[in-house]
Amino acid sequence: MAAQALALLREVSRLEAPLEELRALQSLLQSVPLSELREQAAELRLGPLFSLLNENHREQTTLCVSILERLLQALEPVHVARNLRVDLQRGLTHPNDSVKILTLSQVGRIVENSDAVTEILNNAELLKQIVYCIGGENLSVAKTAIKSLSRISLTQAGLEALFESNLLDDLKSVMKTNDIVRYRVYELIVEISSVSPESLNCCTTSGLVTQLLRELTGEDVLVRATCIEMVTSLACTHHGRQYLAQEGVIDQISNIIVGADADPFSSFYLPGFVKFFGNLAIMDSPQQICERYPIFMEKVFEMTESQDPTMIGVAVDTIGILGSNVEGKQVLQKTGTRFERLLMKIGYQAKNASTELKIRCLDALSSLFYLPPEQTDDLLRMTESWFSSLSRDPLELFRGISNQPFPELHCAALKVFTAIANQPWAQKLMFNSPGFVEYVMDRSVEHDKASKDAKYELVKALANSKTIAEIFGNPNYLRLRTYLSEGPYYVKPISTTAVEGAE
């Protein structure tokens, strides 16, 4: 079959308008194994196919792109980089986005190959065209270009090619296209900066990181909202956080939050700024961040009082992030009755808010209540106290939510049960709640895969607890172990009895 494909390819190269042959070749290639094509790689002459892309014929272009996608997979990245460099350059400037995406996918293969990537680094014109793809209208083209440039920058040679040549001027030129393209370049810069201190140094020397930070703390509230997301990504790395602290950026963000009350447009950027501190706290030390920037916690508590669901959602998410480790839980516990009142509000929202906000509340509560296996009496007393602050009967609250006909809500409620399943006080509550043990064992409640998986995780957490046999009793413990061994998707066989004479 590969021989047939080669014959058709030769036929295509002879003809001026080979539409029928292209259709036949595309159809044939779908059934030719890639291994066979690789054996014939030396015979693949792709130049004519690339030439056909230059004609303004939509179907012909579509067919050629489809054929090239298949045939190029049979060629080694080094071969593509060395022998098709002119075709790649043309492809990046082609008016049809599918041709650009095809070309960029090959660039992606090349930059992943340590032998082939050198060919691209030595091709200034090709690099320039990749940079200019960031400025295109098609988001897929831009994203693929960003990914390729980010991959190129993983080596010292790649960093030098990007930041110590005319390419930096091209990057700055592309940024001037419009606001959207400027943010795409910032996205690339943050991706590169996050790799290592050396990468960050190259990006700061270029002036682009400074420009991003200047926009973050500038007067345009919409720009602030966009820039804080990128700065939060940079803060995900230790060297990124160090840099932001040294440059005084974290203090500036804190000061902007302090002044937010006097800004009628603060709702545009405040959620992102609060998220920034939430992520910062969990990656460094919740206690240190909350002590150094008290406005952060103050604002989170304030946002839970808001009438704006967006503000409430961000506050709830942040509480969940902060309470995801023991130190963060202890920071929240130190706020005393204020946190208990906040929990009551979360309990109310979990019952009465929109489905989306209910799920966010349940996810936050799962994070807050979860304790690692090394539990102390103090931590257990704390989570039990928190649980009782949610409502008059929190266990029934979550059972009620889990019975609603929405799989996402059902799974989120099961996650809360799973979070407390290894804590003795919760096991006693479950055991003493009428019908709860049967509810856990009942497989007929869950109908979709996600729900079955979530129920299985709950059963696993209970069955693996050291205290469960004593609290639930041995018969129930054995039922849990049976459920566990049968797996999440077990269906009990229905026994049928044959009756003589029945039709």
Curated annotation (Swiss-Prot):
Q: Where is the signal peptide?
A: none
One Pfam family named in its UniProt record: Proteasom_PSMB
Give Gene Ontology CC terms: cytosol; proteasome accessory complex
SUPFAM superfamilies under this entry?
ARM repeat
Q: Which GO terms describe its biological process?
A: proteasome assembly
* Keyword annotations: Acetylation, Chaperone
N-acetylalanine: residues carrying this PTM: A2
Q: What is the stated purpose of this protein?
A: Acts as a chaperone during the assembly of the 26S proteasome, specifically of the base subcomplex of the PA700/19S regulatory complex (RC). In the initial step of the base subcomplex assembly is part of an intermediate PSMD5:PSMC2:PSMC1:PSMD2 module which probably assembles with a PSMD10:PSMC4:PSMC5:PAAF1 module followed by dissociation of PSMD5.
Q: What is known of its domains?
A: Rich in dileucine repeats, which have been implicated in trafficking of a variety of transmembrane proteins.
Q: How does the record describe its quaternary structure? A: Interacts with PSMC1, PSMC2, PSMD1 and PSMD6. Part of transient complex containing PSMD5, PSMC2, PSMC1 and PSMD2 formed during the assembly of the 26S proteasome.
- Family from the record: Belongs to the proteasome subunit S5B/HSM3 family.
What PANTHER family would the database entry show? 26S PROTEASOME NON-ATPASE REGULATORY SUBUNIT 5, 26S PROTEASOME NON-ATPASE REGULATORY SUBUNIT 5-RELATED
Official protein name in the record: 26S proteasome non-ATPase regulatory subunit 5
Classification of source organism:
Eukaryota, Metazoa, Chordata, Craniata, Vertebrata
